UniProtKB/Swiss-Prot annotation:
Gene this chain is encoded by: NEFL
Basic and acidic residues composition-biased segments: 526-543
Assigned keywords, A-Z: Acetylation, Cell projection, Charcot-Marie-Tooth disease, Coiled coil, Cytoplasm, Cytoskeleton, Disease variant, Glycoprotein, Intermediate filament, Methylation, Neurodegeneration, Neuropathy, Phosphoprotein, Ubl conjugation
High-level lineage: Eukaryota, Metazoa, Chordata, Craniata, Vertebrata
Domain text: The extra mass and high charge density that distinguish the neurofilament proteins from all other intermediate filament proteins are due to the tailpiece extensions. This region may form a charged scaffolding structure suitable for interaction with other neuronal components or ions.
Residues modified to Omega-N-methylarginine: 23, 30
Region spans: Epitope: 381-391
Compartmental location: Cell projection, Axon; Cytoplasm, Cytoskeleton
Biological function: Neurofilaments usually contain three intermediate filament proteins: NEFL, NEFM, and NEFH which are involved in the maintenance of neuronal caliber. May additionally cooperate with the neuronal intermediate filament proteins PRPH and INA to form neuronal filamentous networks.
Protein name per UniProt: Neurofilament light polypeptide
Region (Coil 2B): 281-396
One GO molecular-function entry: structural constituent of postsynaptic intermediate filament cytoskeleton
Phosphoserine PTM sites in chain numbering: 56, 67, 103, 472, 502
Organism: Homo sapiens
Entry similarity comment: Belongs to the intermediate filament family.
């Protein structure tokens, strides 16, 4: 019976407590947080050792199973005691491991939360420091683009000017050629006039020669008529003489004499006819030669006139072509000049617009920086108030342990009224930032560094604006006044800081043993300082 009761205990409760529990724990570890595996695995050696013990024990128990019937109750009690001690040890180790694992998980969660907080702060700081640089990079890129556009426009203008000079040189060459053609035309016109005069003279000479030919032909015809009439008269006389001789003189024979006379007259007539024909032929040849010469001269003059007209027409066409080319080039040059002027004016308008946008953006950036500085001053004032109230509360708490309840309530009401006035004064002006004594020196130095950085960025932006636009005389005087006022304010702040440091040193030497009266006096002095600083700033603003 004991053997049957021992085996179920070993098979169920032992496995459930020593095997299933670590498995459930490990599965929860995997699902809960994966980063703790290394930590858990580093501390899981006892579990494996316990498992090895269980395996060895189970193997030994398996080997002892046939002889369990021979065991007595004392051996069973010893084995159960050993198992209980092993269970308690393993349970303690598992509890330790669970506790350490829970602590590791809590630590990891804390580190993750801290990491998230630090990442948020880093993101905020990066945004704060990257916004001005991003704007600056954008405007610098825009300025570079505008400068490149201006350089391109200048290069294009120079190229157009070179092209214009080339066109002007071509125009001058064409004008010189035109003048040469005009001179050659005038010369040709002069030669044409001379040729026309020669042609007119040749025509007149030809007309005169034709008239002389007509007169000579008339004279020839007249001489022929006269010659024929003379021949007729001579024949009539000869016939009459023959008749009269035949009638009157019958004695002598006159036929021979008449024949001689007729022969003489015929010879004389033939000679005269021959002389007249020779004279006519010579005269006709002379007139023909002169007419031919005049015809050749007229033909040459006509040819020269036609050639001159042809040359004049060609030169006129060439002059018209040059004139059209000149007009086209002048029109193209005017269009190029108009286009260039329009492009330059458009680029200038764009540059002016971008400069105005840059100027407005710089002014907005300066305004934003100023607002940021004001907000920073307000934040510092609020931090100072919080620190002052904290110090008051700490002082009140320390005072509560030594004073009665009535004195604590009265002192607390008086101190709260005093510090309420001081807090109101701190909100009114930013000079309260450097006049408090309860603010930590490290935080004040850090805030002063931030203020200095903001002022440097504002001064750099103003310097860039001053470089972009030359200041006038009134602006230069205002800038000098602003610089003097800034130097005076810095000197006053340095003096106040030195006074505060000396007062803080005195307070540290005194060991913080101030009472309510001293605190009220200090608060009143701080209020007076704040009011004096506010009045000084108001007077400066009025000036």
């Amino acid at each position: 019976m004991s053997s049957f009761s021992y085996e179920p205990y070993y098979s169920t409760s032992y496995k459930r407590r020593y095997v299933e529990t670590p498995r459930v724990h490990i599965s929860s570890v995997r699902s809960g947080y994966s980063t703790a595996r290394s930590a858990y695995s580093s501390y899981s050696a006892p579990v494996s050792s316990s498992l090895s013990v269980r395996r060895s024990y189970s193997s030994s128990s398996g080997s002892l199973m046939p002889s369990l019937e021979n065991l007595d109750l004392s051996q069973v009690a010893a084995i159960s005691n050993d198992l209980k001690s092993i269970r308690t040890q393993e349970k303690a180790q598992l509890q330790d491991l669970n506790d350490r694992f829970a602590s590791f998980i809590e630590r990891v969660h804390e580190l993750e939360q801290q990491n998230k907080v630090l990442e948020a702060e880093l993101l905020v700081l990066r945004q704060k420091h990257s916004e001005p640089s991003r704007f600056r990079a954008l405007y610098e890129q825009e300025i570079r683009d505008l400068r490149l556009a201006a350089e391109d426009a200048t290069n294009e203008k120079q190229a157009l000017q070179g092209e214009r000079e080339g066109l002007e040189e071509t125009l001058r060459n064409l004008q010189a050629r035109y003048e040469e053609e005009v001179l050659s035309r005038e010369d040709a016109e002069g030669r044409l006039m001379e040729a026309r005069k020669g042609a007119d003279e040749a025509a007149l000479a030809r007309a005169e020669l034709e008239k002389r030919i007509d007169s000579l032909m008339d004279e020839i015809s007249f001489l022929k008529k006269v010659h024929e009439e003379e021949i007729a008269e001579l024949q009539a006389q000869i016939q009459y003489a023959q008749i009269s001789v035949e009638m009157d003189v019958t004695k002598p024979d006159l036929s021979a004499a008449l024949k001689d006379i007729r022969a003489q007259y015929e010879k004389l007539a033939a000679k005269n006819m021959q002389n007249a024909e020779e004279w006519f032929k010579s005269r006709f040849t002379v007139l023909t030669e002169s007419a031919a010469k005049n015809t050749d001269a007229v033909r040459a003059a006509k040819d020269e006139v036609s050639e001159s007209r042809r040359l004049l027409k060609a030169k006129t066409l060439e002059i018209e072509a040059c004139r059209g080319m000149n007009e086209a080039l002048e029109k193209q040059l005017q269009e190029l000049e108009d286009k260039q002027n329009a492009d330059i004016s458009a680029m200038q308008d764009t540059i002016n617009k971008l400069e105005n946008e840059l100027r407005t953006t710089k002014s907005e950036m300066a305004r934003y920086l100023k607002e940021y500085q004001d907000l920073l001053n307000v934040k510092m004032a609020l931090d100072i108030e919080i620190a002052a109230y904290r110090k008051l509360l700490e002082g009140e708490e320390t005072r509560l342990s030594f004073t009665s309840v009535g004195s604590i309530t009265s002192g607390y009401s008086q101190s709260s009224q005093v510090f309420g006035r001081s807090a109101y004064g701190g909100l009114q002006t930013s000079s309260y930032l450097m006049s408090t004594r309860s603010f930590p020196s490290y935080y004040t130095s850090h805030v002063q560094e931030e203020q200095i950085e903001v002022e440097e960025t504002i001064e750099a932006a103003k310097a860039e604006e001053a470089k972009d636009e030359p200041p006038s005389e009134g602006e230069a005087e205002e800038e000098e006044k602003d610089k003097e006022e800034a130097e005076e304010e810095e000197a006053a702040e340095e003096e106040e800081a030195a006074k505060e440091e000396s007062e803080e040193a005195k307070e540290e030497e005194e060991g913080g043993e101030g009472e309510e009266g001293e605190e009220t006096k200090e608060a009143e002095e701080e209020e007076k300082k704040v009011e004096g600083a506010g009045e000084e700033q108001a007077a400066k603003k009025k000036d």
